[in-house]
UniProtKB/Swiss-Prot annotation:
ATP binds at T12, T13, S14, T261, G303, Q307, G402. This is Glycerol kinase. Belongs to the FGGY kinase family. The lineage of its organism: Archaea, Methanobacteriati, Methanobacteriota, Thermococci, Thermococcales. Keywords: ATP-binding, Glycerol metabolism, Kinase, Nucleotide-binding, Transferase. ADP binds at T12, R16, T261, G303, G402, N406. It comes from Thermococcus onnurineus (strain NA1).
Amino acid sequence: MDRFILSLDEGTTSARAIIFDRESNVLGVGQYEFPQHYPRPGWVEHDPNEIWEAQFRAIKTAIERAKIEPTQIAAIGVTNQRETTIVWDKSGKPLHNAIVWQCRRTAEMVEEIKREYSEVIKEKTGLVPDAYFSASKLKWLLDNVPGLREKAEKGEVLFGTVDTFLIYRLTGEHVTDYSNASRTMLFNIKKLEWDDELLEIFGVPEGVLPEVKESSEIYGYTKKELLGAEIPVSGDAGDQQAALFGQAAFETGMVKATYGTGNFILANTGKTVRYSDNLLTTVAWGLNGKVSYALEGSVFITGAAVQWLRDGIKIIKSAPETEELARKLQSNEGVYFVPAFVGLGAPYWDQFARGLIIGITRGTGREHLARATLEAIAYLTRDVVEEMERLVGIKELRVDGGATANDFLMQFQADILNRRVVRPVVKETTALGAAYLAGLAVDYWEGLEEIKSLWKAEKVFGPVMDEETRRKLYRGWKEAVKRAMGWAKVVDA
């Protein structure tokens, strides 16, 4: 009987399930969107039940489309939007909406904590104190949901990022992996354990926390009533770490960029924990008793800016239209768009930056905004890569995610970076990374060498822009960013 791997890829706006075979081919996909909820300006939530329903529906659809039986699934891997914070009881019932990574409700709280504990947090977690991470979200829930702290003290509350919630619903086990734990701001990435001092700073009782395991081991088995089979759930990694693994970026200095709702650039630093003032240090994965680390630059809004063109100001009907519009111009004609809708992430870390379009004239049209949006994605990526280059040598950028289908963007990215940009044959690298981690745990694949041999380039974009143009464009971008920074403080003063 042929055996396959099921990968669950739970994102910020949709839940996907993908069936892979041994050669990394995609046999079946299920994908369902779920809504985001915005109870106040700057607040972003999900209903955890809507996440679960979309994910479970996606699982059933993927199995059906792959024309296989659940008994043919050798293992399940889970990958997820990170930092998003959920609390639930032991029956699996959510006790509040999930607070999404994009949510800014704890920005002021974090500013206070940052003043006193910034260095401690950076040293232990590799993270820059920001409302983006789970710790402040969990503190907010414990402090603001009536009765939650009391229940937590009694051991009646379970906390987790989305991977933990899904694994709990699938297996009844309360676990996470090193990569997801490293994004909570409560986990010591050197000792590989929850940190007592950090728990005290954020007022988190240890009893709510999941057990932390490697990224590739059996965490539990699916409850038989769900799929009619007890399938090992044996891979778990945050979406960006999973993409790094799916890109076969196993060696120090290998870099990938995922173009999704936001852009996330990771550089493998091997067994070395490297620190940068403006980048995050994170656990890439734990595998076979060894831990690999990474430098990460998180850009909060990139693909979401294209969604805004479509759904917010309605100047495009679909994302691919941006390429056609951008190509109508020979240059950006001085128009820049800084999509700082929820502040700016790496390397700026300005919670109070806001979106800005500059350089508009009477002749500015849809094509200028479309081009400026695509160029902004590339500029924001360069901002991060430049920071990384101070610590690790970078020869090329391996790319994945929806926006990599846009050849205009990929060529502009190569031009503005002055580096090769490589798009792989299998675009589903995030889901594939989770599948690889799950498969390795049950000996479906033999090891990293076999996985490396499966990775193939589909297209390589080489830089063709002259140095003077590159320098001029990037200088304009930096000026635009300066004007966007701190804007929320100006208007709130």
